[in-house]
Amino acid sequence: MARRFRVAIYAPHFAEYSYRLAAALAKHCDVRLVLNRKDANQQWNLDWIPAPSPFDTRIRDLSLRRSGAIGLPRSFLDILTFRPDVVHCHECPEYFTAGLMELLRLTSLPRILTVHDAIPHSEGGSGTNTSEERLRERMRSAATHVTVHGQSCIADFSSASPDYRGEVTSSMHGVLMVPPAHNTPVKATDGRILFFGRMWAYKGLDVFLDAIDLLSKRGVHHQAIVAGRGPEMARFGKRMENMPSINAIDAYISPADTSALFQSAEVVALPYKDASQSGVLASAFGNCRPVVASATGGIPDVVTDGVNGLLVPPSDATALANALERVLTSRSLAASLTDGAHQTAAGSLNWDHIAERLFATYRRVAS
């Protein structure tokens, strides 16, 4: 009997993304997924994700503290003893993945690296200091193949890493935070706008608050939820306290509450000043909710204006307010965009479709 193709996925971060990918890939090949104990189940309950075909998951303590002295070597052995045909890693500026990629460089194994942010964000986020830049360079130089999320991200990667000689291909960012099938759907609350995520400056919270001020002055019925942690919550905390239509949630949000938040929104706002792709966008579509988003980075590769959301120029509060008003005041438009979000989730952002294309790439690079 022929040996089945084997893929090892090393994911100290992006646990939900990696688990959904592994579950879809397992229909085509044997998969071993290595996760970080700190990251697994933090944002989403992995037990809620359907996995019709079994695969092997190893959860290790990956830290630079004493406990990581055992977990880190074990995680490397998890990869090597699986005897994979391909190893797939995520780029994140930390020492675990950089060390594994350089170790694997001593072998003939193909090394696939998913680059989530080809260019660091302008204000805040990871990859914005010299140490993280060096780690990113180490990982990219050790990769035999790079995947990014969308065609615009290929251009960004080529600009950021002009000396990279391997192949770069697009593999879309699949849906996240999809509610379990047994859950009762949450009905959208009339006029509710959700702004969700890690609150760094590039996310455009200041632009969003300016747009909410405009909606209030125009008398547009709305309520906005700003949910997440980060420095911008502290910077704009007092301002939000004085805005009656805003409910700010600066606290940990459980997976169940996160799903309910997305479903309760009529529209999700992503007024990013710059972006590659967005897990928040993937989560909005995973919950069949349309978006009003900035036309920047890889977002227009996923959001088709007037189909599954509305696109606006970045840092333009008036354009953002106008687009939000259109969705909130037109039931037919809101319904059409919601259907478009559902179709996108079932189409280009469906993990089965993504895994099928990735598996073809794995076979090709391993041949």
Go through the PLM ranges and name each one.
Residues S141-P180:
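Donor nucleotide-sugar binding/catalytic pocket of nucleotide-sugar-dependent glycosyltransferases
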Residues L77, E102-L106, I119, N129-V146:
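Membrane-proximal helix-turn-helix segments that form the acceptor-binding/catalytic region
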Residues A319, R326, L333-S348, I354-R357:
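A short, well-ordered alpha-helix in the C-terminal region of glycosyltransferases
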Residues A260-S276, R289:
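Acidic donor-binding loop of glycosyltransferase active sites
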Residues F236-S259:
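Nucleotide-activated donor-binding/catalytic signature segment of Leloir-type glycosyltransferases, i.e.
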Residues Y10-I70, S75-F76, Y95, G99, ...:
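N-terminal strand-loop element at the rim of the active site
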Residues D305-G306, L310-A317, R326-S332:
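Conserved acidic donor-binding segment of nucleotide-sugar-dependent glycosyltransferases
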Residues E16-A23, R198-L214, P231-A234, A275, ...:
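A conserved mid-protein helix/loop that constitutes part of the nucleotide-sugar donor-binding site
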